[in-house]
Amino acid sequence: MRRNLSFWIIVLAILVGLAACRNDDVVLYPDETPTPDGYTNTSSYRGLYVLCEGNMGSNKATLDYLDMTTGRYSRNIYPSRNPGKVMELGDVGNDIKVYGSRLWMVINQSNRVEVASAASAVSLGSVDIPNARFLAFDGKYAYVSSYVGPVNGPSVLGEVYRVDTLTLRVDARCTVGFQPEEMAIVDGRLYVANSGGYSAMQGGCLLYTSPSPRDGLLS
């Protein structure tokens, strides 16, 4: 009887030990770094947003904010500014830009672009774009480069999506090269840097098209 009891005590101890060693997901709570001693604001800007990528597959992209007037740094502000949304911003923050009064964030592996108020970081909506990468703006439009295909899938030709900044709707798209990255709009032309795909057989290149629908190149 004692031998059986000792056996089950050992088994229970092993199970408790295994449970204690399990790697639980880390919850990222908002926190702040206080104003440094002797801080003096020498910038003309009110603040600076920082989009933290987070580990791929962990759904831990976060948005931080540096208040330039006080020097206070606030981490992971998005959940508290948007209590009605899921706690995490998404998976893999890849690009962030302020255009007009809006804050645009590319959340790569969540396949979307999150749009918020630049003044408050309160969400205004989102745009679904597969494997989105980078942003560029011109007039009333946002341009988003996209790998299109999944990370672990075969390489496919990428695309550039044009988004109406007022309605947050995709109204045009254009096929470009493999794995398009950053873009520039110069003299009415949209230049797209294509990294060339995951295969060494697919060389990188620079393409240009017209951001204007009247030329029929972005359709």
Where are these regions (language model features)?
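Single conserved hydrophobic/aromatic residue that forms the stacking wall/gate
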Residues: Y208-S219
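Short, solvent-exposed loop/turn segments at conserved positions within beta-propeller repeat blades
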Residues: M56-N59, V106-Q109, V151-L157, S199-L206
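Short coil/turn segments that connect the beta-strands within blades of beta-propeller domains
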Residues: Y45-R46, S101, K140, G188
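Short loop/turn segments that connect beta-strands within beta-propeller blades
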Residues: T69, S117-S120, D164-T167
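Bacterial Sec-dependent N-terminal signal peptides
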Residues: R2-W8, A13-L48
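A short beta-strand motif characteristic of beta-propeller blades
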Residues: S74-M87, V122-V127, R169-C174, R214
